[in-house]
A protein has these predicted regions:
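Intrinsically disordered, low-complexity non-transmembrane regions of multi-pass membrane transporters
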Residues: 1-34, 219-238, 272-275, 285, ...
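N-terminal signal-anchor module of multipass membrane proteins
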Residues: 2-81, 89-105
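Juxtamembrane interface elements at the cytosolic ends of transmembrane helices
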Residues: 10-11, 16, 44-47, 181-189, ...
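Membrane-embedded helical hairpins/re-entrant loop segments and their flanking transmembrane helices
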Residues: 15, 19-30, 55-73, 251-322, ...
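Hydrophobic, membrane-embedded alpha-helices of multi-pass small-molecule transporters
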Residues: 33-43, 172-179, 197-198, 236-266, ...
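Re-entrant/interfacial helical elements at transmembrane boundaries that shape
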Residues: 48-53, 83-96, 265-274, 304-316, ...
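Juxtamembrane helix-boundary/capping and inter-helix hinge elements in multi-pass membrane proteins
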Residues: 53-56, 78, 99-107, 131, ...
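Membrane-embedded alpha-helical modules
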Residues: 106-216, 327-436
Length: 442
């Protein structure tokens, strides 16, 4: 198999053999398009919600997710089946860097974009290093105990933001609770693809119930569809220019460490499902993700990462063809060029978004615990216990450190604190033999 060449995709139908379609195989055009729609739907919920939580344009973020996925496809030589969508890891640091209040468009979006570009640059450099020397150094620097602690700290750091966003009125608070229940019911009582799209389906159901409560029963502020009716079907999204603020860059750039760990985990999952060795492409995958993040941030989009939602779709369908993700990317780009679609997104009530954010931020925190469970992390070891305890409090309490005009926020201190504490506390006395047990004669 050529390292830098594109594969020769062989035509295959899902009706043949076991129905498994490998990354270097393809479906007929119609089936590829349908699978592309399915992957576009799978990424939709989070790719729309994350930029809204940061005050970015969701329409532009969807467009850039499609462009970023195509860039990733070309850089990896069409051999890694993945979709790049808006990353939740940026939410906390972008809000901290810009002081965004969670409503409307972020007035300090420019400095956030500069930080996203800086993060993408760090991400790309790490990818280039991985291409040269492999991933062992990353796994030693950030073992599962560190990765899990940092991911959980991010979720806990975001918790106050989610709660404050739904505290404007008693009605908003109850509608947020209703949204949480809608998503929870979808997660528990549905199966298959509907269950995998729990955020999207839950949002739709919650919006419908909110519309009934307000537009029909008059219990709250009615949803206004004027912008939707006046918006054009096709047009350019709103682009923004980045500004490079050193403090914002210092705060946002460390997210690259989380994205690297997340991407490596996703690639290992894909390798396990496809039976293909993805190690030769890990460096290029990181470079592709980093460049896509820089490109997105340069025009006003959010930082991107490979999506677990789409990995779940592959696990269900057994279709791993990389051409399916090209189709999904094209669909996302078409949606990004529709102002009417963007206007429809902006009709989602703030209370519904806040309720969804409670679930999403909670799931981020739980994902950290899942990393520990899956990797059998031993929290009975004092070194691990102290590192995790300190990391969680630094993140949840938004502990900040200021040095020479630079301020490192809670997520930054939690990330670097976890790495440093793990390096200091995980030492073992490997040269000291265990005490010898002497058996005395009776």
């Amino acid at each position: 198999m050529a390292m830098f060449g594109f594969p020769h995709w062989q035509l295959k139908s899902t009706s043949t053999e076991s129905g498994v379609v490998a990354p270097d195989e393809r479906l007929p055009f119609a089936q590829t398009a349908v699978m592309g729609v399915q992957h576009a739907v799978a990424m939709f919920g989070a790719t729309v919600l994350m930029p809204i939580l940061m005050g970015l344009d969701p329409n532009l973020s969807i467009l850039m997710s499609g462009i970023g996925t195509l860039l990733f496809f070309f850089i990896t030589g069409g051999r890694v089946p993945s979709y790049l969508g808006s990353s939740a890891a940026f939410v906390g640091v972008v809000i901290a860097a810009t002081g965004f209040n969670g409503q409307g468009i972020n007035p300090n979006i420019s400095i956030a974009l500069g930080g996203i570009i800086a993060c993408g640059l760090v991400y790309t450099v790490i990818g280039l290093v991985v291409m040269k020397i492999g991933t062992r150094w990353i796994e030693r620097l950030m073992p599962p105990v560190v990765t899990g602690a940092v991911v959980m700290a991010i979720g806990l750091n975001l918790a106050p933001i989610a709660v404050k966003s739904v505290s404007a009125s008693a009605f908003d608070s109850w509608m947020a609770v209703m949204t949480v229940l809608c998503i929870g019911l979808v997660a528990v009582f549905t199966r298959g693809m509907i269950q995998r799209l729990l955020i999207l389906v839950g949002l739709i159901v919650a919006c419908l119930l909110y519309g009934v409560m307000t537009n029909v029963l008059g219990l709250g502020k009615a949803v206004d569809f004027t912008l939707v009716s006046h918006a054009a079907w096709f047009g350019l999204p709103h682009f923004s220019t980045p500004a490079f603020n050193s403090q914002a860059m210092m705060l946002i750039a460390p997210v690259a460490v989380i994205l690297v760990a997340e991407n490596l985990g996703h690639l290992k999952a894909v390798a396990g499902m496809t039976g293909r060795n993805m190690d030769p492409y890990m460096g290029r995958a990181l470079v592709g993700d980093g460049l896509a993040t820089m490109l997105s941030g340069s025009v006003g989009g959010s930082g991107v990462t490979t999506y677990a939602e789409n990995i779940g779709v592959m696990a269900v369908t057994k279709v791993y063809s990389t051409l399916v993700f090209v189709a999904a990317a094209v669909i996302a780009m078409l949606l990004g060029f529709s102002p009417k679609f963007g206007a429809l997104i902006h009709t989602i009530p703030a209370a519904v978004i806040g309720g969804a954010s409670i679930v999403v931020f909670g799931l981020i925190a739980v994902a950290g615990a899942r990393i520990w469970v899956q990797n059998r992390v031993d929290l009975s070891q004092n070194g691990n216990l102290i590192m995790v305890a300190v990391t969680l409090v630094l993140g949840a309490g938004d502990f900040a450190l200021t040095l020479g005009g630079f301020t490192l926020g809670g997520i930054g201190t939690a990330t670097f604190g976890a790495i440093l504490l793990n390096a200091l506390l995980s030492r073992r006395l490997v040269d000291v033999p265990p005490p010898e047990v002497v058996h005395q004669e009776p």
